[in-house]
């Protein structure tokens, strides 16, 4: 059964297509494009898992393949340069198409290449992780890391279509699955407490139909937010809950020790503790949030003792979400969220990092 959500965008509208047959919507899109070349971008892990799929891609289409190393280190200008070289050697034109097949790193990387090659060519996202299906593939954010700083270079460039197949989730490790759940917990805690409660109960039964429904709900919430605030003026900032500190943690561990979903889980608990301190959130809500992460074996405290509050502060001061001389945190409230700017020179933040993260 195929189901389609249409996302409205000020750049170009695009569909999110839920299907077990990824070829049908891809073929339909390519038929409208005419005679085109395709570059499939993936990573070694996904390629090894789905070699028959990539063989069929090569059989069915005039296509080329770029395989990146797995992990956040591939989200770099060096990898972008390698892909540019491949496109130029293959004589790609502005009418040709990039197709990303992978998780958030591959989607962001391929989307950034599509946004910048010939000042923009078409691209399709086929997200293969839970995190990329419910979050990173939707909304048009593309980009790469730069000199250890997370997502420092990027753009808003929506895909021409997103093809979501739950079949890809069958090969996810428990750790990768939990990272996707982390983003769903974020959406539920801020925007839909009923979804949050379902996620809290889900580990006990693992009903696959319920999982599909929760994925659909999470995607609907992300769609609603990015349609109302595509360029992150206000409402979309809510989706940065946990990400200010989370991105700093990722940067300091070079995108290796903690995966994205794990780093933002720590960030969300930190911001929730701060919200309790500011009397914006109840202790009961904080404990429920911690329980949700613990149910999926997600970290809620910083275990990398080598990270100091001073080192985190240094990275936080470079965060792209900052406003002037203020670091912007997103604090959850009983009924939603608030943007919480704090001056970069304010010593309270250093104290909060030390006390709430229990680090030096």
Swiss-Prot record:
Cofactor(s), by name: Co(2+); Zn(2+); NAD(+)
InterPro entries: Dehydroquinate_synthase (IPR050071), DHQ_synth_AroB (IPR016037), DHQ_synth_fam (IPR030963), DHQS/DOIS_N (IPR030960), DHQS_C (IPR056179)
Origin superkingdom: Bacteria
EC id: 4.2.3.4
SUPFAM superfamilies: Dehydroquinate synthase-like
Pathway(s) per entry: Metabolic intermediate biosynthesis; chorismate biosynthesis; chorismate from D-erythrose 4-phosphate and phosphoenolpyruvate: step 2/7
A GO cellular component annotation in the UniProt record: cytoplasm
GO molecular function, one term: 3-dehydroquinate synthase activity
Keyword line: Amino-acid biosynthesis, Aromatic amino acid biosynthesis, Cobalt, Cytoplasm, Lyase, Metal-binding, NAD, Nucleotide-binding, Zinc
Function field: Catalyzes the conversion of 3-deoxy-D-arabino-heptulosonate 7-phosphate (DAHP) to dehydroquinate (DHQ).
Family: Belongs to the sugar phosphate cyclases superfamily. Dehydroquinate synthase family.
Protein name, UniProt field: 3-dehydroquinate synthase
Organism in which the protein naturally occurs: Streptococcus equi subsp. equi (strain 4047)
Species classification: Bacteria, Bacillati, Bacillota, Bacilli, Lactobacillales
């Amino acid at each position: 059964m195929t189901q389609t959500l249409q996302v409205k965008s000020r750049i170009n509208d695009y569909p999110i297509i839920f299907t077990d047959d990824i070829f049908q919507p891809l073929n339909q899109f390519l038929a409208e494009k005419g005679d085109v070349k395709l570059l499939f971008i993936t990573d070694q892990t996904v390629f090894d898992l789905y070699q028959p799929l990539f063989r069929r891609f090569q059989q069915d289409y005039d296509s080329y393949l770029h395989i990146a190393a797995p992990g956040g280190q591939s989200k770099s200008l060096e990898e972008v340069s390698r892909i540019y070289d491949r496109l130029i050697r293959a004589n790609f034109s502005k009418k040709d198409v990039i197709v990303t097949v992978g998780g958030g790193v591959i989607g962001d990387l391929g989307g950034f290449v599509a946004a910048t090659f010939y000042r923009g060519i078409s691209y399709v996202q086929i997200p293969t992780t839970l995190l990329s299906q419910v979050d990173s593939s939707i909304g048009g954010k593309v980009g790469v890391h730069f000199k250890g700083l997370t997502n420092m270079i990027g753009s808003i460039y929506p895909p021409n279509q997103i093809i979501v197949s739950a079949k890809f989730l069958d090969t996810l490790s428990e750790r990768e699955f939990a990272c996707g759940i982390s983003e769903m917990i974020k959406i539920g805690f801020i925007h839909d407490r009923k979804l949050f409660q379902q996620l809290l109960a889900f580990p006990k039964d693992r009903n696959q139909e319920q999982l599909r429904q929760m994925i659909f709900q999470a995607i609907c919430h992300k769609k609603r937010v990015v349609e109302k605030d595509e360029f992150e003026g206000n409402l979309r900032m809510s989706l940065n809950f946990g990400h200010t500190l989370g991105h700093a943690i990722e940067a300091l561990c070079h995108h290796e020790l903690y995966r994205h979903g794990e780093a933002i889980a720590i960030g969300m608990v930190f911001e929730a503790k701060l919200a309790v301190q500011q009397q914006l959130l109840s202790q009961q809500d904080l404990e429920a949030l911690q329980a949700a992460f613990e149910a999926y074996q997600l970290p809620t405290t910083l275990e990398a003792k080598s990270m100091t509050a001073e080192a985190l502060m240094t990275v936080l001061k470079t965060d792209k979400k900052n406003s002037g001389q203020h670091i912007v945190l997103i604090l959850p409230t009983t009924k939603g969220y608030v943007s919480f700017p704090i001056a970069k020179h304010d010593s309270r933040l250093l104290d909060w990092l030390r006390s709430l993260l229990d680090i030096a």
